[in-house]
Amino acid sequence: MATSENDKRSKPSSLRSIIAGSTAGAVEIAITYPAEFAKTRSQLNRRLPDAKKLPWPPFGSQWYAGCTTLIIGNSLKAGIRFVAFDWLKSLLQDENGQISGPKTVIAGFGAGFTESLLAVTPFESIKTQLIDDRKSQNPRMRGFLHGSRVIFQERGVRGFFQGFVPTTARQAANSATRFSSYTMLKQMAQGYVAPGEKLGTASTFALGGIAGLITVYVTQPLDTVKTSRMQSLEASKNYKNSFVCAARIFKDEGIFTFWSGAVPRLARLIMSGGIVFTMYEKTMDALDGLDPERRYI
């Protein structure tokens, strides 16, 4: 009976995972979006000669172009990511509730694939095309809903899912790296606290930030190919597929170009890693306070 109760408390319900994950995702992107804008703009502008590069706008509303899209998308994808990871982790853990490093990586890959299919690819495609559209003298897209309609009219459903393979590869690697890094670091940190005691907010934030740093340098090449090949407005004319894109980048611009945009992405993912894991853990604690027996949530 005690074991059953412990299992129940160690395995959050799907609803609880969705609530905690979605809350964490919304707060994360609302705080870190300007760094995401800078990363995407630097990648999209690198194809232009110096004389045609647009100057960086003053910090303000233009830095939040596409923000509404990404807040909605990030909240959705974080909820999907955490519920998928928690579910897969519960399937892969042993009878004592423990999970090995390789199995954590597998759960992370599965979570990344799921969120890419259901949220990341369509929402990031819209976001990137909104930002790219603002490079023109006469932008045509007036926000999320209007931009979605323009994309559908001009490119059909493929306009939302073009780039699924590189995006999914990037997202699966992203989730696998982030979850496995955070889980490993958390297990190490818990060895320094009393049994049953939870890590503090500062410790959780620091561990999430370190996991974010590791994630950037592992997945940045996939992120660069995804943005260059699949989701700019001119991508279909410039590249046939992601492999051609990667080869062209390597040949024309050199290997270090794969890490273009790493610095602003580094700033965002260190912050977002700390924010998202801290918010997830704290939301779980708050839900425990509201429903300690986990009867309703």
From Swiss-Prot:
GO terms for cellular component: mitochondrial inner membrane. Keywords: Membrane, Mitochondrion, Mitochondrion inner membrane, Repeat, Translocase, Transmembrane, Transmembrane helix, Transport. It is a multi-pass membrane protein. It is found in: Mitochondrion inner membrane. It catalyses: citrate(in) + H(+)(in) = citrate(out) + H(+)(out). Its EC number is 7.-.-.-. Solcar repeats lie at residues 12-91, 102-188, 199-286. The chain crosses the membrane at residues 18-31, 61-81, 99-119, 160-180, 192-212, 251-272. Belongs to the mitochondrial carrier (TC 2.A.29) family. Mitochondrial transporter that mediates citrate export from mitochondria to cytoplasm. Both ctpA, ctpB, and ctpD play important roles in citric acid transport across the mitochondrial membrane and function in a redundant manner. This is Mitochondrial citrate transporter A. The lineage of its organism: Eukaryota, Fungi, Dikarya, Ascomycota, Pezizomycotina. The gene is ctpA.
